[in-house]
């Protein structure tokens, strides 16, 4: 039997989707299918061809195609969903809910039809509610429908800590839990620089400022860009999750998971520490939290529930 490369479909060929497709191919994680709506088929094909023509220079052999035809995605191992409208300055995540929910339902039907055994990773905002929508619409088991936010939020936190300490980001570890919004919960107590607790290295008021900047990280970029939202770091975060799955690395990474009693929550998608491997989300890790951390996570979960109330 012939051995084939993994097949990864990226739904949505905007800045985030296209950047994700490019990084996936560059790392040779699989052949990539970049999908967008029929009105954007030619630009999508153009982006894919442009990426492919970089392969001799960058030295990768993965194939990339652009299309609006979901038949091209058939038998994908992983489907990454980035499609939807982008956040604009002054727009709350709640404003996005109903428009992007319709997009999720439409995309999910196609994914189920053509790739019924795939693992789905959702990025579209508001990501906690959109991941829940895809889970319900797909009928897939919970370990095969995952949301991405914690890797990105943790990356932002690690970036700001590294800048504060003038250290390599490689030596900074941390976890950001909860919903992908202003009530996310950076766990300072579980964050380290070269194995040393951050609380031993950074004054409390500076740590609090870093936590607050992390919470507002997406909005900071939205305001600086003036049009659109972040895409390099979100794409890189998606790729880290995909790599953990296709290589069965069993990485400990924060991800948006469906909770059934973990951390005291039921029937909600929320960012928690997980193990990602060949089966998708293989395990949820329950950390011991202080009363203050529990209260912050409950507040974050309540924010997610409030967004979910807008779901049709």
UniProtKB/Swiss-Prot annotation:
GO molecular function terms attached to this record: L-lactate dehydrogenase activity; L-malate dehydrogenase (NAD+) activity
Source taxon at top rank: Bacteria
Amino-acid positions noted as binding substrate in the UniProt annotation, renumbered to this chain: 87, 93, 125, 156
UniProt catalytic activity: (S)-malate + NAD(+) = oxaloacetate + NADH + H(+)
Keywords recorded for this protein, A-Z: NAD, Oxidoreductase, Phosphoprotein, Tricarboxylic acid cycle
GO biological process assignments: lactate metabolic process; tricarboxylic acid cycle
UniProt: NAD(+) binding residues: 12-17, 36, 100, 123-125
EC number(s) on file: 1.1.1.37
Catalytic site positions: 180
Record-linked NCBIfam families: MalateDH_bact (TIGR01763), PRK06223.1 (NF004863)
Record-given protein name: Malate dehydrogenase
């Amino acid at each position: 039997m012939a051995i084939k490369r993994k097949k990864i479909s990226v739904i949505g060929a905007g800045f985030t989707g296209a950047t994700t497709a490019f990084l996936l191919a560059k790392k040779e994680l699989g052949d990539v299918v970049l999908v967008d709506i029929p009105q954007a088929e030619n630009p999508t094909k153009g982006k894919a061809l442009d990426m492919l023509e970089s392969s001799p220079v960058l030295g990768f052999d993965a194939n990339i195609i652009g299309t609006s035809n979901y038949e091209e995605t058939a038998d994908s191992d992983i489907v990454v969903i980035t499609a939807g409208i982008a956040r604009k300055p002054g727009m709350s995540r709640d404003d996005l809910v109903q428009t992007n929910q319709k997009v999720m339902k439409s995309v999910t039907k196609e994914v189920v039809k053509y790739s019924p055994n795939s693992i789905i990773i959702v990025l579209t905002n508001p990501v906690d509610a959109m991941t829940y929508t895809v889970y319900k619409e797909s009928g897939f088991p919970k370990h095969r429908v995952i949301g991405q936010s914690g890797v990105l939020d943790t990356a932002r936190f690690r970036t700001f800590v590294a800048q504060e300490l003038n250290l390599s980001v490689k030596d900074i570890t941390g976890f950001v839990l909860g919903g992908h919004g202003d009530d996310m919960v950076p766990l300072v107590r579980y964050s380290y620089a070269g194995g040393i607790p951050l609380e031993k290295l950074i004054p409390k008021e500076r740590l609090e400022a870093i936590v607050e900047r992390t919470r507002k990280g997406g909005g900071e970029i939205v305001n600086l860009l003036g049009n659109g939202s972040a895409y390099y770091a979100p794409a890189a975060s998606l790729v880290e999750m995909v790599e953990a799955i296709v290589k069965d690395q069993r990485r400990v990474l924060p991800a948006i998971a469906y909770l059934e009693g973990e951390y005291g929550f039921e029937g909600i998608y929320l960012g928690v520490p997980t193990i990602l491997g060949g089966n998708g989300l293989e395990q949820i890790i329950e950390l011991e939290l202080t009363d203050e951390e529990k209260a912050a996570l409950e507040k974050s979960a309540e924010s997610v529930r409030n967004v979910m109330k807008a779901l049709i």
